[in-house]
A protein has these predicted regions:
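Rossmann-fold cofactor-recognition segment
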Residues: 58-73
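Conserved NAD(P)H cofactor-binding loop of Rossmann-fold oxidoreductase domains
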Residues: 95-102
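Conserved glycine-rich cofactor-binding loop
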Residues: 24-26
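Flexible N-terminal pre-Rossmann segment of NAD(P)-dependent oxidoreductases
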Residues: 1-20, 215-217
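Catalytic loop of short-chain dehydrogenase/reductase
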Residues: 104-117, 125, 136-181, 192
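Hydrophobic positions on the long internal alpha-helix
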Residues: 78, 93, 123-131, 135, ...
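C-terminal helical subdomain
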Residues: 177-227
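Conserved glycine-rich Rossmann-like NAD(P)H-binding loop of the short-chain dehydrogenase/reductase
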Residues: 38-54
Length: 227
C-alpha cells in the first residue's frame, strides 16, 4: 500500500497510473518508455491516431487515447473513459507545446498567439481541471509540465511564446498551491529548458524520479534542465 504521507517509499512509480498529455512527441515517447520501464501504467494521449501508433510501438503495454485536448468537453469525456477503464490517475505529465515566433515585437502575430495560447495554456487548463480531483485523491499525485527558460529572459521575437509559457507556469503554481492546502501528498513540478531536443532521456528520468521523493519536497519547484 502506498504511504498516505505522500512519500512513495521504495515503490517509486511502480503501480501508479500516469497520463501523458501530448505523448506523441519525442519527449512523450521517452517519458512513456521510462515510466513503463519503472512499472507504471502509462496512458498516452494525443490528437493524431497515426502518431499514437508510434507510441504503441515503443510501449506496447500502454493504453492510447485520441483526444482534442483544447476542448474541455472532450477532455472531461476522456477522464470519464479513463476512470471507467483504469480508475483515477496518479500522475499527469503535460507535454503539449509548440513554437511560434521571430520577427521582433512586430512579428508577434495574433495567429501565433492564438496557436500558443491554445496549445500551451488551454490544454494545460483543461487537463488539470479534469484530473485535479484524481491527483488530490492519490497518495502520490504528481503534475509535471515543461516550460522554457525564455520566461526568465524574454526577447521581443519570443514574446508570444514566453508569455504563454509564463502563464502555464503561473497556472501550475496555482494548482500546486491547491495541492499544498489539501495536504502533503500531491506535487506540481515545472521543468524548464532552452530546447528540449537532446534532453528527452533526461526529462524522462526526472519525471520517473518524481515518485522517489515526498511531495512536500517537490511541490511548486522549478527545475532547469540543461545539456
Amino acid at each position: 500500500m502506498v504511504d498516505p504521507s505522500g512519500d512513495p517509499g521504495e515503490r517509486g512509480a511502480a503501480g501508479h497510473t500516469v497520463l501523458i498529455a501530448g505523448a506523441t512527441s519525442a519527449a512523450g515517447v521517452a517519458v512513456a518508455v521510462a515510466l513503463a520501464g519503472a512499472g507504471a501504467r502509462v496512458l498516452a494521449v494525443g490528437s493524431n491516431e497515426k502518431r499514437l501508433e508510434r507510441v504503441l510501438e515503443a510501449v506496447p503495454e500502454c493504453s492510447v487515447y485520441v483526444c482534442d485536448l483544447t476542448d474541455f468537453a472532450a477532455v472531461t469525456a476522456l477522464a470519464a473513459t479513463v476512470h471507467a477503464e483504469h480508475g483515477p490517475v496518479d500522475g499527469l505529465v503535460h507535454l503539449v507545446g509548440g513554437w511560434r515566433g521571430g520577427g521582433g515585437l512586430d512579428g508577434q502575430t495574433d495567429e501565433d498567439w492564438d496557436f500558443l495560447h491554445t496549445r500551451v495554456l488551454q490544454t494545460l487548463r483543461n487537463t488539470t481541471r479534469a484530473f485535479n480531483a484524481d491527483l488530490l485523491a492519490s497518495f502520490t499525485g504528481r503534475l509535471a509540465i515543461v516550460s522554457s527558460v525564455s520566461v526568465d529572459a524574454p526577447t521581443p521575437g519570443g514574446a508570444n511564446y514566453a508569455s504563454a509559457k509564463a502563464a502555464a507556469e503561473t497556472w501550475t503554481r496555482a494548482v500546486g498551491h491547491g495541492f499544498a492546502k489539501a495536504g502533503d501528498t500531491a506535487a506540481a513540478v515545472i521543468f524548464a529548458v532552452r530546447s528540449l531536443e537532446g534532453l528527452e532521456p533526461r526529462l524522462a528520468a526526472e519525471v520517473v524520479a518524481l515518485w522517489d521523493s515526498p511531495a512536500a519536497s517537490l511541490n511548486n519547484t522549478r527545475r532547469i534542465l540543461a545539456p
